[in-house]
Amino acid sequence: MIDSKQKIAVLGAGSWGTALAALVARHDYPTILWGRDVRVIQSIDIQHQNFRYLPSIMLPQTLRATTDLAAAVSGADWVLVAVPSYAFTETLCRLAPLLSIGVGVAWATKGFEPGSGRFLHEVAREILGGDAPLAVVTGPSFAKEVTLGLPTAVTVHGEDACFTQMVANAMHGPMFRAYTGNDVIGAELGGAMKNVLAVAIGVADGMQLGMNARAGLITRGLNEMLRLSAVIGARPETLMGLAGLGDLVLTCTGDLSRNRRLGFALGRGQSLSDAIREIGQVVESVQTSDEVMRHAEQNGVELPISEAVRAVLREEITPYAGMKVLLAREQKPEYLDILFKANCSL
């Protein structure tokens, strides 16, 4: 039985934060959603819809929403952060003085801290201190499908097993499976890298390079995930699961993916600024490609696909030139034992 006193505060009223808040509210957890946009918050709290990010989808009437962060967090048993990566540090800095001792913080944000390239768990630990239970929620999950109640599976990773299980229990239900693990680095890496790789697949599809090219890029993209994971302390099985392969396949093939749509637009010849403006929401890959390559270069790992995406997003080369560079690479073994040969060249 759910503890009636267990209250969940969800921070971030975009599509993903709204979807997760609606999910746990439907599971009978007292849930309050915090956001900055007054109109969005009012539409959720009064009309039970997020007119901007999830239009025409009804939300639970029990879900409350507010622009008052202190009110949202007051009395919360744990907090779920679902803001874009560029707002993660600022949000935690505002949150920290409002948290009671022992209140855990989970996040469904994907990416790195902009500028520093730090993993988000490093940022959270620095801001929230060494005693706060932490966890990351990740996996193949489009917000719209979650809100519509379509079957979804994610994974929750954290060092505190009790808190990790608590987060998973709140999300787990008839149409939403929540697995658990303790590889925070691997979970975060997969969630960040898949956005970058999805741009490459989107470009290939926009250029009409065919299904063979799509499959090849996805597979070699997974190879890049595994190679980088091996030198930063992540476990390969995490990247072969929902946090890596699962999220990669969804983001690279699903038309709801903003990063795939960005790549598709670029592949069709659209400018970067026009493509981002047309999408109308944050596209994490634009910033994340720099941070992925920062980690690769610091660790001496070659990531040709990610590097090409970074160059395209910096507008240093055209999408066509990027594909030509990848296709012109010298022939070499596939390195099926890549899990154990972190420094092999792709």
Curated annotation (Swiss-Prot):
Subcellular location: Cytoplasm
GO biological process, one term: glycerol-3-phosphate catabolic process
Catalyzed chemical reaction(s): sn-glycerol 3-phosphate + NAD(+) = dihydroxyacetone phosphate + NADH + H(+); sn-glycerol 3-phosphate + NADP(+) = dihydroxyacetone phosphate + NADPH + H(+)
Residues binding NADPH, per UniProt: 15-16, 36, 110, 143, 258, 282, 284
A single cellular component GO annotation: cytosol
Family: Belongs to the NAD-dependent glycerol-3-phosphate dehydrogenase family.
UniProt-recorded name of the protein: Glycerol-3-phosphate dehydrogenase [NAD(P)+]
Gene, per the UniProt record: gpsA
